[in-house]
From Swiss-Prot:
This is Suppressor-of-stellate-like protein. It comes from Drosophila melanogaster (Fruit fly). It comes from the Eukaryota. Residues 194-219 are annotated as: Disordered. PROSITE patterns: CK2_BETA. The gene is Ssl. Belongs to the casein kinase 2 subunit beta family. GO terms for cellular component: cytoplasm; protein kinase CK2 complex. InterPro entries: Casein_kin_II_reg-sub_N, Casein_kinase_II_beta-like, Casein_kinase_II_reg-sub. Pfam families: CK_II_beta.
Length: 219
């Protein structure tokens, strides 16, 4: 399968092309010098041709299968965004609201960060993490195309460890279910007992003789 077309002019580097694909707005530009540093590639499996394509300054995406290039760039991206320079780049995107806001009403449009549910490629797509309610949500469809491993499971927490001044306060308000203004009892919100669940069998202490008596021989 050939690479999807960019929303921008196709002439340019592979990274320009990748970042220009609609739905890739969460991703960050990894500098060429970071990719060229072999230390940053330690432990990643790839061939030299894949790396050359990622670093190609004049990439032509016609009839080109980009699966391996996307994976390599994605795994490098996950490492870069937890580096000091990468965190600063992501901070700018966070403060601009590039990642969207929490869908929870009482978080009052708190800005969110991208997060992965796995650190392994091709397990799940990217999700969004709200630092206010400390929950994870599915992003809008056009923002959920990237692999979650591009961000990893640790990124939001590393981000706020480095930038503690950006940690928001937890939400004060909480939704309270009501009917005609009256608050519901907790039991009213619990699911009914399953009809299929077997009844609890209670053995009568009267119907059975104690074990010591049953073992007495008859005379």
């Amino acid at each position: 399968m050939s690479c999807p077309r960019s929303i921008e002019i196709p002439d340019g580097s592979w990274i320009d092309w990748f970042l220009g694909i609609k739905g890739h707005e969460f991703s960050c530009r990894v500098p060429n010098e970071y990719i060229q540093d072999k230390f940053n590639l330690t432990g990643l499996e790839f061939d030299s041709q894949t790396l050359e394509v990622v670093l190609d300054p004049e990439f032509d995406n016609e009839d080109w299968d980009c699966a391996e290039e996307k994976k390599l760039y994605g795994m490098i991206h996950a490492r870069y965004i937890v580096s000091p320079r990468g965190i600063e780049d992501m901070r700018l995107k966070y403060e601009r609201g590039d990642f969207g806001s929490c869908p929870r009403v009482f978080c009052k449009r708190q800005k969110v960060l991208p997060v992965g549910l796995h650190d392994v490629w091709d397990k799940a797509q990217v999700k969004i993490y709200c630092p206010s309610c400390n929950n994870v949500y599915i992003p809008l469809p056009h923002n959920g195309m990237l692999d979650g491993a591009m961000f990893g499971t640790s990124f939001p927490h590393m981000f706020f460890m480095q930038l503690p001044s950006l940690i928001p306060s937890p939400p004060v308000e909480k939704y309270i279910p009501r009917i005609y203004g009256f608050q519901l009892h907790k039991k009213a919100l619990m699911p009914p007992e399953s009809a299929e669940s077997p009844p609890i069998k209670v053995e009568s202490s009267v119907s059975k003789s104690p074990s010591w008596l049953r073992n007495v021989p008859n005379f």
